[in-house]
Structure formats: structure tokens, C-alpha cells
Amino acid sequence: DNISGTMGHKNLLSSILFLTLPFVIYLIRVGKKLWRLLSIVLLACMLLIILQTQTRAVFVALGLFVITIAIVYKSQIKLKQLSLLLVSVIVGLSLFFTILKYTERYDAFVHEIHTALDYKNSLRYKLYKSSFYLISENPLLGVGPGNWKVKIPKYGLYFGSFGTNYAQRPHNDFLWVFAEGGLIPGISFILIFLILLRDSYYLHKNNKESTFFYSLLFATFIGFSFISFFDFPLERFSHNIIFFFLAAIIVAGKLRHTGYKKELLPKWLSFSFLGIIFFVIYVAIIRYQGEVYATNAINSQAEQDWTSVVEDIDKAY
């Protein structure tokens, strides 16, 4: 039941593959023969990996993606295309269950479904409930960046547990931002998604040259908002880079379509942005080093080398 990869977490691997879907699908439609063939092969590999990782949030996000595209183009879908879609879904589900049986992950998948249905006894429900208590006591300013995992034991997350597992985040980016940043960052994070959804749909309706690509982005943002609600892609820089790259495409497209006035920024503002960039780079380096030492500590723990565990944890902080 073990899966090996370079992303460090199977859910994060699936979610970053989902974020790249619009580029691959767009190339299948507009690319030349070689690029189209390569894109089809790449899409098949991506879907196969997503099936193998069994990330439920991404499964639902894929369903939302397909449903959104179907609704957006409902007037253009013909019976032949609908039949092809249904056949593809049936083939995909058949392939999925075949993979489950072949890799002996069927029982694990059924267990995950039962866990999801019995949500009140699940760890995720406890995460959300404790996070709501934390937010209710710190609604304006939050508890500060990186402090969710420090403050959350106070709100009953580990009551009745044996201390063998410790959560680093609430498995919900929206709750995470609210809990650590407070009201303004929490609302701002929600507004980012709402604005991107509004503008991507606007560009789909009004930009005839790239209407298909913007519809893909619209469906991607809907799916990714669901993933962010049940997972933690905000934790990884790789996800943030791709997400804000997609956001930049939407912002640039909206500015080109509606028009804008060029203005020179004051020098002090330019230097302020430069300072923020250097600070972000510094934080990224610190976090990267922390991840390296944390990984070393986990490996040392597996080898029961407790001296190295303490040393690596000290270096991680």
C-alpha cells in the first residue's frame, strides 16, 4: 500500500497534476500532431497517477471540472460527444477498479470511503472542529503564521488520543489562513478565488480567441477551490507558483480586454516590493532547510537514532 514519489505526499502530487490540466488539454486541442500526441500520452499518465494515489478531493475536483465544462458548453454538446464522454467515464472507472484490484488497494479504498461517511469519528472532523474553536477565540488577528500546530492542542484535538500522531495543519487552506492570519487574510484568501472565478468566466464569454482556454481555467479554479477546502496545497511553493501563474494569466487577460492606463510606480513602492521579494526568498530558504532537517529527523527516528533526531529537529528550527 506504499507509494513512492518526489512530492512527499500523494495528495499534493495529485493536486499539482490537477493544476496543470488546462495546459495539457489545451495542447490536445490546438497543438500540432507531435505535441497533440505527447499531450494525450501525458494526460493518460497524469490520470493514471491520480487514480493510483486515490486522492478523494482530487477525484471530486475532476468531477467538478468535467461537469463545469459540460455546463459551459451544454448548448454545443452533441449526442455523439455525450456518448463519447459517457464511454470514457465508464472506461475510466473500469480501469480504476482494475488498478485497485491489481495493486491490492481495493480494501484500503473501501476503508477510506467508510471513514469519509463516518465523518464525525474521523480525524478530519476533529481538525475542523478544533480549528473553529481556535478561530472563534482569535477572530481578528489569528494566532500568527506557523502557530496553528502550536495552539491547536488547547482546543481538544488530541483528547482521547495516545499522542502517536500530530497534525501540522487543519487539512483546509481556508481554515488555516483564517486561524493563523485572522479576519482580513481569511476574507482576502476567499476573495482571490471568487475574483478569479468571476474574471475567468468573463474572459470565456467575451474573449472569442481564447474562450476555450479560459473555460478550462474557470473549471480548474472551481476544482482547485474544492481541493483547497479539503487539503493543504497552500503549504507547497510548487502549488503556489502554478496557481498564481494561472491567476496572472487571468489578470493579464482581463487588463488587455478592459484596457488599462500605464503609470509609473513611485520609487519607494518599487523598493518596498523588492524588499518583500527578498523577504519571501529568505523565508523560502529557511523553510526549505527546515524541511531537509525534518526529513533527516524522520529517517533517524525510523533507525531509532534518537541523538540524531534531537540534533536535526534543533537545526530544523
Where are these regions (language model features)?
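Alpha-helical transmembrane segments of multi-pass inner-membrane proteins
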Residues: 1-102, 179, 188-209, 213-229, ...
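TM-adjacent membrane-interface loops and short helices in multi-pass inner/ER membrane proteins
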Residues: 9, 125-167, 174-177, 181-188
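Amphipathic alpha-helical repeat elements characteristic of tetratricopeptide repeat
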Residues: 19, 41-42, 125, 272-275, ...
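Membrane-interface helix-loop junctions at the exits of transmembrane helices
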Residues: 51, 97-104, 141-143, 150-161, ...
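Short helix-adjacent coil turns
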Residues: 182, 207, 304-305
